[in-house]
Amino acid sequence: MTAAIRTQRAGSWWFPGICLVLTGWCANQYVSLIGWYQQHRELSEVAAFLVLASYVVGLLPMLVFAGSWADRLGRKPFTLLALIASIGGSVLLMLGAQAEMWLHAGRVLTGVGMGLAMVAATSWIKEVSPGASGAVRAGLCTSLGFAVGPVISGALVGATWNPELAYLVHAITAAAWLVLIAFQPGTPRREPVQQAVQGTSAQGLKIFNRLVLPMAPWVFGLATSGFAVVPALTGRGAGASLLFSTITVAVTMGLGALIQPFARRWDRPGTARLLVIGLLTAITTYLVMIPVALTGSTALGLVASVLAGCANGILLLGGLGQVLALAGPGEVGKLTGRFYSVCYIGFLIPTLLSLWRLFADPLYFILLLGVLCVLSLVCVLSNRTLLAVPKMQPVKSGS
């Protein structure tokens, strides 16, 4: 490979990478405004978290189906669609000032854009990145988008008391990048026969199902625990100040992004080290949340957000790294979609907590999360030896 080609390959990952940042920005821009909507748009806690969770309605179908489409038809068309959906999501959120249903519609379309980006843009980055750097780049861009979105929206709303302005800023920025990326070359589409030959091995699927999926819900489970559960436990859930909400999101998602370059150094090929470290950090997070639930301490809550962010970043890097290493070249999008679809189970934790609080003490909800996290760790430790088994021949794409 010539130096010119290497330079082109190294530089081109920025185009889908920025798409992940922009769709992640859109996905989380509502997060820091949850308390603001409760205070100034008179949404109940349950209603505000249902708006947050409605995002999953648009996201999951894209994660389940769009990966295979992108594997066959190429990454670029679906990356462009991701940006278009993300722009549409921000536009619909702007209409939320008129009726709550537009908030739900905007969040659903935002989920469509994020789901498309997660499978198509992540796979695009993988294809133009050498070695294991694809997972680091994709994970970092995703986390960076999740971090900057709520900070920008929180800052703009804090200064103007106008969330519609925050959504407009995102829509304009994403539209500008859409025009730019439209003129960049994409990855080639794969023929059905080629895709079948380049499928994931049976051993790879076994590792994915037994080792990766059990830890996947905690990737975003820890993220939402840090920026949504912590304000609820400190007594600031329904009346959380915009500043406190923005800080918890910035701390959680910011550390999720910042820790990934360091966590990469802790990894060892052929091991589940990052998954174990991430789950141990997650368990520690929920241990710290126990006194937060008992005392409502803001200081301890911020410590929990720090730990949650670290766990999120480590688990995202470790899980995505395993997925991209296991997936056959013709099924990168498909396996990535499966991984993220399970990751987003954790996104429902704040909504479940808001419903739990109607009937029981939130302390027991935190204890339950901790126990489930321990069970995931046991599952990972029990199956980590599968990584030592050589990968066999790929199975057909339809499996």
Please place each PLM-identified region on the residue numbering.
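Cytoplasmic helix-loop-helix junction between adjacent transmembrane helices
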Residues: 106-142
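Symmetry-related core transmembrane helices of the 12-TM Major Facilitator Superfamily/SLC fold
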Residues: 165-182, 365-384
